């Protein structure tokens, strides 16, 4: 159980006390990785959204991750049963479908939504934007590029991953992250 929890999550999470996000996160990460006992650090964005496919809609937690750095702080890559973290940034164009940003879903979440690889799911943000027609929720289509199975039902049924760049754009957090994940040598 301990390994499953620590495999899906990093050992330490650093966030801004005001919860407005971290602006100078690259500089902070440079300092953090120099601390003795720290193996790796990676930025992340965390938010709640609704994912919809067909007649199915589910409230989930979405994590924006840096595909190149995430493997150093969690076992997400090892828990993938299909796809790869790199697909979050560059989905396969060979299908002939329009290129969309990628999303990786927990196996149970995918089952609940009824999606398969290369299906497009709608992500709906909790915050709305004002238009001449009134308040409209922010919606974006993401291409399902992979599935993970952590062995923890709560994670596998309520968690999705997108690239940190997609998350920054979708949540209007340009140059900002929710925090930094850290993996240490000895817990």
Locate predicted features:
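Membrane-interface junction motifs in transport/secretion proteins
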Residues: 1-28
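Short, intrinsically disordered, charge-balanced linker/junction segments flanking boundaries
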Residues: 1, 83-88, 185-187
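A structural signal for hydrophobic secondary-structure junctions
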Residues: 26-175
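Solvent-exposed loop/turn segments connecting transmembrane beta-strands
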Residues: 20-23, 53, 187
